[in-house]
Regions:
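Residues forming the flavin
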Residues: 1-325, 329-330, 335-356, 362, ...
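Extended, charge-enriched "interface" segments that sit outside catalytic cores
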Residues: 303, 309, 320-435
Length: 435
């Protein structure tokens, strides 16, 4: 750093890498401390090295740091579990995708998760280790995530509960490792192992890795601008857990935005900022910059004032044009989105103009306990009724013919249905956002 401008990076080996922009995405590695019972060790995720010294450098240029905590559950061998004693949780019949491209195909081979529960015996075993728990003996003083407390925290705070859910989640298709969600813990390994073996279906469980708590440095995000650039140093950007967030999507979205803005900075172009009514990324960053956080921040739909506008189905419509303008979304992707939007709007227009006669409409309406009509009425009006869905209006000959003639896919049909069903709410929210 020279004259409050970033000059580059010096590695631990003393190698200098010059750059006009630098993005720090340190995760939980800054002065990290891992706790497993009474054992404490420096290191990031299990087996990785800590980042030591960087916090002091940043504090030396005026940045203020804090300390946070998170935790992770044990990883176990899925082959050692008895799933017949658990409740199966199959995946969605028609799973949605994160991507709107046609490159990824629908999942055809999903692996089920399972649910089991702790019990009073498990709780007694866990309590027997509280004296050696860093959560209770004062070794951990940092603030952890409010919405995913450790199992020892749950049985201590909710002592009236006889059991807590455990979600048994496969790590992937090509591994036998399972993630025991709901059992995050920093208790000693022997207590973790003994307690899990008292859980139904886990009587013969084999461990890969124990759970642990992890403390790390972060920098309160009020020290950043909305571009995720630090206010103190031009060209220096922070993204992810260094800003006090927790969660994969939260970190990934910040990394994307910081990377975009670091690139724009080098090209001497205006920063790219998403507003609260444009994307959840906009809500996330605005919350961090304006309100800050003293506990690991997680994104919820309830944090957004305009969540009727920020829907999963229209993410491509909202953001692809912006991505294309930045050069990170292809022309093909933009054209695909425009075609989808055009078809959806035309389908909505069809419902607005097309009428249906009582003799065709009433059997459908009556089957859904919806009031019959006495004269021809617009399909849009009938479709807007709360208990009438796309499956119902597809029973009208004209609707099914339109879908087939225009080769409408599921995305287009869903988009049109949402625009019809929520038209009043969407219009009202757009009006509020524009004020």
């Amino acid at each position: 750093v020279d004259n409050q401008k970033i000059q580059g990076v010096i590695t631990s080996l003393g190698i200098k890498i010059y750059a006009k922009s630098v993005v720090l995405t340190n995760g939980t590695f800054l002065n990290v401390l891992i706790h497993i019972g009474e054992k404490h060790s420096g290191g990031g995720r299990a087996g990785a090295s800590a980042s030591v010294g960087l916090t002091a450098v940043l504090e030396g240029i005026g940045s203020v740091s804090g300390r946070m905590k998170t935790g992770t559950p044990p990883r176990v061998d899925g082959r050692s579990l008895d799933y017949s004693k658990m409740s199966e949780q199959p995946g969605d019949l028609n799973p949605s995708k994160f991507s709107f491209t046609d490159l990824t195909k629908p999942l055809s081979n999903q692996i089920s998760c399972h649910i089991t529960h702790t019990n009073l015996d498990v709780h007694d075993i866990l309590r027997s280790g509280f004296g050696r728990s860093p959560m209770f003996n004062g070794a951990i003083k940092s603030t952890g995530p409010r919405y995913c407390p450790s199992i020892e925290d749950k049985i201590n705070r909710f002592a009236d509960k006889d059991r807590h859910q455990i979600f048994v989640e496969p790590e992937g298709w090509n591994t036998v490792e399972y993630y025991i969600n709901g059992f995050s813990t920093s208790l000693p390994e022997d207590i973790q192992f003994k307690a899990l073996r008292a859980v139904k279906g886990f009587e013969k469980v084999k461990f890969f890795r124990p759970g642990y708590a992890i403390e790390y440095d972060y920098f309160p995000p009020t020290q950043l601008t909305h571009s995720l650039e630090t206010k103190l140093v031009s060209g220096l950007y922070f993204a992810g857990q260094i800003n006090g967030t927790t969660g994969y999507e939260e970190a990934a979205s910040q990394g994307l935005m910081a990377g975009i803005n670091a690139s724009l900075k080098v090209r001497e172009e205006e920063s790219f900022i998403l507003k609260r009514n444009e994307a959840y990324i906009g809500v996330l960053i605005d919350d961090l910059i304006t309100k800050g956080t003293e506990e690991p921040y997680r994104m919820f739909t309830s944090r957004a004032e305009y969540r009727t506008l920020l829907r999963q189905d229209n993410a491509d419509i909202r953001l692809t044009p912006k991505g294309h303008a930045l050069g990170i979304a292809s022309e093909k992707r933009l054209r695909r989105m425009e075609e989808k939007l055009s078809k959806a709007e035309a389908f909505v227009g069809f419902f607005r103009t097309q009428s249906v006669k009582p003799e065709e409409a009433n059997p459908v309406l009556e089957s859904k306990d919806s009031a019959p009509i006495r004269q021809s009425d617009k399909m849009f009006k009938l479709f807007s009724r709360p208990n009438i869905g796309i499956k119902d209006v597809r029973k009208f000959v004209a609707v099914e013919d339109y879908i087939n003639e225009n080769n409408l896919d599921r995305e287009v049909i869903e988009q049109a249905e949402i625009q019809v069903k929520y038209s009043g709410y969407i219009a009202k929210e757009k009006n509020n956002a524009d004020k």
